[in-house]
Amino acid sequence: RWSKDDFFLALTQGVAPGGRHLYPAMPYTSYKGMSRQDADDIYAYLMTRPAVDVAITANEMPFPFNQRMALIGWNLLFRSQDPLPASSQGSSSQWQRGRYLADVLGHCGECHTPRGALGQMDLGKPMQGGDLGRFMAPDITPHGLAQRGWTPQDVSRFLGTGLAPQGSAFSEMHMVVDLSTRHLTPEDHQALALYLMGEQPPAAVPVKMGQGSDAGRMTYLDQCAGCHAREGEGKPHVAPAMRDNATLRQADGKNLIVSVLDGLPAQ
């Protein structure tokens, strides 16, 4: 049985009892800023959960990545590096609370910050978007959010419900909302939105109407309009609106293309 000290060391340093090094898929490089009180509170909650008898699966990583001793070198390089720089400007207590929620407890940068050659977060590009393989975690800097039409009010609503005029949460972000952010208080939703957008948020950029093409229009009407409606207004709780959809406004279009090709499971 792990003690509170064992748990805190694993969370913030990536070291399990017996000196076993955890892979940084467990985001201890973000959790290293966690307060001892918050860690102890999490531990206390976990101790109220019934035990589950589940065998630990074997490490299936290929050589040399299955050698945990290599993590000693990785940790020397990156565990003690500076915290992720703030992605917005602010100084109020609410902004500070939002930063703690985003950068530490929520570890948003682990997905939304680009990675370096050795898998470390690129501290020079905080929250500027990360490659998740099939999907991209979008840029959630104030500029990036505003370019896709987000406002602080919409960000706060999205974190609480997974819904906003800019679209609905899907894939990994749906799990984040469902298992995490929707359980926060409205005050914490507002603090997160304040931090992500900054204390002087940039104005949301309106959608610029393009010329389009007759072929694209006919394809949309034939394949998409049945759910998303003829003018892209969507149907509540059935299909999101397309007019102001943030996924449509991402520069590379990858997430839109993957969503069309793969579809999205019901969530």
Predicted region positions:
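Sec-exported extracytoplasmic/periplasmic mature domains
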Residues: 12-16, 31, 44-51, 103-106, ...
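Inter-heme linker and motif-flanking segments adjacent to c-type heme-binding CXXCH motifs
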Residues: 17-20, 49-57, 91-95, 117-121, ...
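Flexible gly/pro/ser-rich segments immediately N-terminal to CXXCH heme-c attachment motifs
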Residues: 31-33, 102, 145, 178-184, ...
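Sequence/structural segment immediately N-terminal to covalent heme-attachment motifs in c-type
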Residues: 73-76, 85-116, 121-129, 210-237, ...
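Short amphipathic alpha-helical linker/capping segments at the junctions of internal repeats
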Residues: 28, 61-66, 175-181, 209-215
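Extended, well-folded interaction surfaces typified by the phenylalanyl-tRNA synthetase beta subunit core
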Residues: 54-72
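Extracytoplasmic electron-transfer domains, predominantly the class I c-type cytochrome c fold
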Residues: 1-26, 36, 42, 46, ...
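Short acidic, glycine/Ser/Thr-rich loop/turn "cap" segments at secondary-structure junctions
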Residues: 22-31, 80-86
